[in-house]
A protein has these predicted regions:
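Polybasic/polar functional segments that serve as interface/processing modules
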Residues: 1-80
Length: 80
């Protein structure tokens, strides 16, 4: 199964990001803007300018996983 097992920290970026970025670009944002290590086992969550899309970046111990979700209707609620 893909994804974390057990308890894991979830870190949410509060500002929208350029959704053309892939796993490496988002990992760089984790380092630069969140001042965190993208390979620490936490899940990092980003949203597009339109709040109907999110991407999650996660290091599973063997590589970087990139998960994406687009809502058909509605928007994700996001912290300010």
């Amino acid at each position: 199964m893909i994804g974390p097992t057990g308890a894991v920290r979830v870190m949410v970026a509060t500002k929208p990001v350029d959704f053309r970025k892939g796993a490496e670009g988002l990992a760089a944002l984790v380092r630069e803007t969140m001042r965190a290590d993208p390979f620490d086992g936490a899940i990092y969550v980003f949203r597009a300018k339109r709040a109907d899309r999110i991407k999650l970046v996660y290091w599973d111990g063997t590589g970087v996983c990139l998960f994406a979700k687009r809502l058909e209707d509605g928007e994700f609620r996001w912290p300010k």
